[in-house]
Design a protein with these regions (language model features):
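Short beta-strand elements
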Residues: 64-77, 176-203, 310-312, 389-398
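N-terminal alpha-helical targeting/anchoring segments
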Residues: 51-106
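Acidic low-complexity segments
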Residues: 19-31, 36-52, 92-179, 212-246, ...
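Internal metal/ion-chelating core segments
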Residues: 175-269
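Dual-mode signal for accessory low-complexity, basic/Gly-rich regions
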Residues: 271-458
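Structured beta-strand/loop patches that form or line metal/cofactor-binding pockets in enzymes
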Residues: 38-71, 156-177, 364-389
Length: 458
């Protein structure tokens, strides 16, 4: 009766909207769990409608589309807490899944610190008018490829993903809400010989996407990489572009999760109220931002999302909480649940005053970094880490790019590198790709005295 792939469904002889379908699923599961003895239930059915276009060697190679419904559920039996996910929502399969949850509840240990779900909230529907337009996406891919090749790239590859996510929430505490959000992500990589470049664009509206700019950026980076330069290991001033900056700032956001603080994997443990980063740096999480690619009206516990300042002028102001971590920290949920771990929705970093060209002048002599991968922590609790630069790393002398570098690895401490920011750019952009899971809105930034080692001979 319920099918996985669809935007509208036939239900008892009539067509219903996705909102009603998700609510019907949630109510069915919630009522059955309460009938079977659950004292509290929170059900979140989700429909994800996506179109992905991959391109390689200047041509589209793969087009995939999907529309999938799944159900996440938190159920509480006395002092026992169970988290479940159902991906087969056919009537028989759903009944079998519920039966399995009931049986498995006998194996779950009781929790002595179980916080009740928050007071019920009925949320106003949040809808999107955005559509996934395959023809327009194809045009955007062509624009990105053409602008990259005009800049000198020999080969252009990448992926464009358009998604509309529809979430509902039904709680035994009376929580009820429906939320729709659209996101469009374009990631472009360029190649000339052994050199590579990267550009990207992210938005919640297709009209705000900048495919030509993303292609132009990736193409210009690979063009500049044709002039190799020599370098030695040591401490350098660096200009972090938004892509690498977002990846590194994301780890600061992870350290703000109260779950990671308790688990001993946060470098911000015991530092509440202390100045831990540069006064230039203010970081907030904002799950309510209309421009945030991951924004939603409610978190997984039915708490309204909001803007939470995590670090203000370098001083740690707040961790991210769900109701259980909030109880243990004697505070309130910040609207960031995760039934297991609270996490950021969208990270937003304050901007500075400099253009990119002015940032290069401020750097004067150092290294400009575009992107990175293979970030590894030697010690999560202290923030000691390394990461390898990719897709454009450049030697800067007297405020001008003089040559490209290979095999550059940052080997330093996360808190240390952000404790002495020299300047921030004035232009911010959203960054999200497979190395940056939490969308981050930030400018470029100049950091002094960053320790660099060689990942390969260069």
């Amino acid at each position: 009766m319920w099918k996985v792939l669809r935007l509208r469904c036939l239900f008892y002889g009539g067509f219903i909207e996705m909102k009603e379908e998700l609510f019907l699923l949630a109510e069915k599961v919630s009522k059955e769990m309460c009938r079977r003895g659950a004292s509290e239930v929170m059900v979140l059915p989700t429909q994800n409608e996506s179109l992905m276009v991959r391109f390689s060697n200047n041509k589209v190679t793969v087009v995939q589309s999907w529309s999938v419904i799944s159900i996440d559920m938190l159920s509480i039996f006395g002092k026992k807490r169970l988290i479940s996910r159902f991906e087969n929502i056919g009537e028989n399969a759903l009944a079998e899944s519920i039966e399995r949850v009931i049986k498995e509840s006998s194996f779950v240990q009781e929790s002595e610190e179980l916080a009740p779900l928050p007071t019920s909230v009925k949320f106003k529907d949040r809808r999107t008018t955005q559509k996934i337009d395959a023809n327009r996406i194809n045009d955007y891919v062509s624009l990105a490829i053409n602008s990259a090749t005009r800049e000198g790239a020999e080969r252009v590859s990448g992926v464009f993903t358009g998604s509309i996510v529809r979430d509902a929430i039904i709680g035994s505490n009376g929580a009820e809400g429906y939320d729709e959000r659209a996101s469009f992500d374009l990631n472009v990589r360029t190649f000339t010989g052994d050199n590579s470049g990267q550009g990207l664009s992210c938005a919640t509206m297709m009209s705000q996407l900048a495919p030509e700019e993303a292609g132009r950026e990736a193409g210009s980076i690979v063009r500049m990489a044709k002039n190799p330069a020599k370098w030695s290991e040591g401490k350098y001033s660096v200009l972090l572009g938004p892509i690498i900056g977002a990846e590194l700032i994301g780890h600061v956001g992870d350290s703000c999760s109260a779950f990671n603080v308790e688990a001993g994997t946060s470098c911000l443990t015991g530092k509440m109220g202390k100045e831990v980063l540069s006064k230039e740096l203010t970081i907030a999480d904002d799950g309510s931002s209309k421009d945030g690619p991951s924004s939603r009206s409610f978190d997984d516990e039915g708490t309204p999302t909001r803007k939470t300042v995590l670090l203000e002028k370098g001083t740690l102001k707040s961790y991210l909480h769900n109701v259980n971590t909030a109880k243990r920290f004697n505070t309130y949920s910040t609207g960031n649940a995760g039934w297991i771990a609270p996490s950021a929705w969208n990270l937003v970093i304050d901007h500075g005053k400099l253009s990119f060209e002015e940032s290069l002048k401020e750097l004067k002599n150092g290294i400009y970094m575009v992107s990175n991968w293979y970030t590894r922590f030697q010690n999560y609790s202290t923030g000691d880490f390394s990461t390898i630069c990719r897709d454009g790393t450049f030697l800067v002398e007297d405020g001008e790019i003089k040559g490209s570098l290979k095999g550059v690895r940052i080997s330093d401490n996360l808190l240390k590198i952000f404790q002495s920011i020299k300047s921030m750019g004035k232009d911010r952009r959203w960054v999200r790709w497979w190395e940056v899971r939490t969308p981050t809105f930030l400018p470029d930034m100049v950091l002094p005295e960053v320790n660099l080692t060689k990942a390969q001979e260069s």
